[in-house]
Design a protein with these regions (language model features):
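A short, charged, Gly/Pro-tolerant segment at domain boundaries
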Residues: 263-281
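Glycine-rich phosphate/diphosphate-binding loops that line cofactor/substrate pockets in enzymes
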Residues: 118-130
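Glycine-rich phosphate-binding loops that contact phosphosugars or nucleotide phosphates
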Residues: 128-248, 254-261
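CheY-like receiver
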Residues: 8, 26, 123-126, 171
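HTH-adjacent hinge/linker in prokaryotic transcriptional regulators
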Residues: 2-7, 15, 22, 29-36, ...
Length: 281
């Protein structure tokens, strides 16, 4: 679909229902913020049902919400409502360095504000009591899950990473109430995520989800939700600041985990450090 989002909205204004016009008015007034919202979040902000938002998208000619959100982000980036975080086309490298630094600091600060200390403490209780902890994700989120698994490997051998979506659901099918899933998903709304979490929950496993959307389908299945406050545009999928924000959450988990069992963690760190010493030249 090549037509600009705002042109489409103007063309189909007369086709919208009263509640559809409520959605349209919100998008006009909050265009920059709306491109980051999930369908459930947008519905809540507009005080309408998710089905109303979906019908709004179809009325404009989109297949669904995701396609509409991408079109909105494209319009924001190229139209009058320019993304203020985008560097100028002629920016020099020094400016780009400052820009990147600002993105990372914004991601970390946003996550610090969103992350619940109580949720972290509850998550660590589950991690300590677990027989096994399965670190999972898809795409760029799986890269972060691998990093989390590697970080915990210095202090415990109960963590394992499962990358393939088929292997994830297979692992979930063999879980028990002694197991924990630590799933990384920015959207909290992918088919593979939902399939794996449903299977894990059916077998009694606990679920910890690191996500940006506390009202996402995945969050509704999770026992504990750890919020990543960094915002990602649909046009910037896989951004590194998002991964850094996720790893910030992971580091808080690690620090709490260590302090809650300082003697055991210290011994484990000493043993793994000694084991790695022979690898150095």
């Amino acid at each position: 679909m090549s037509t600009n989002f705002w042109e489409l909205l103007q063309q189909h204004q007369g086709d919208l229902t009263k509640s559809g016009r409520t959605v349209a008015e919100y998008l006009v007034q909050h265009a920059a913020e709306a491109q980051y919202l999930s369908i459930s979040s947008l519905a809540r902000e507009c005080q309408v049902a998710e089905a109303t938002v979906f019908r709004f998208c179809r009325a404009l000619g989109f297949e669904g919400y995701h396609e509409m959100r991408i079109a909105l982000a494209q319009a924001n980036a190229t139209g009058v409502l320019v993304n203020q975080q985008e560097p100028a086309p002629d920016a020099d490298t020094a400016t780009l360095c400052e820009h990147a630094s600002a993105l990372f600091m914004t991601a970390i600060n946003g996550t610090q504000n969103a992350l619940s200390p109580q949720a972290v403490e509850q998550a660590v209780v589950l991690l300590h009591s677990a027989r096994q902890v399965f670190c999972m994700g898809q795409g760029g989120s799986m890269a972060a899950a691998n990093e989390i698994c590697a970080r915990f490997a210095c202090i415990t051998n109960k963590f394992r990473a499962v990358a393939d979506s088929h292997m994830q659901v297979m692992a979930a099918s063999l879980m028990t109430e002694q197991d924990v899933v630590l799933f990384v998903s920015y959207s909290g709304a992918t088919r593979d995520l939902m399939e794996t979490l449903r299977t894990a929950k059916a077998n009694g496993a606990k679920v910890i989800l690191i996500t940006h959307y506390e009202d996402s389908p995945g969050a509704k299945l999770a026992d504990i939700v750890l919020l990543c406050g960094a915002q990602e545009s649909p046009l910037d999928s896989g951004s590194i600041p998002i991964k850094v924000a996720v790893l910030y959450v992971a580091e808080v988990l690690v620090l709490r985990y260590i302090l809650d069992d300082k003697p055991g963690s210290t011994e484990a760190q000493e043993r793994t450090t000694e084991a790695l010493a022979v690898k150095l030249l």
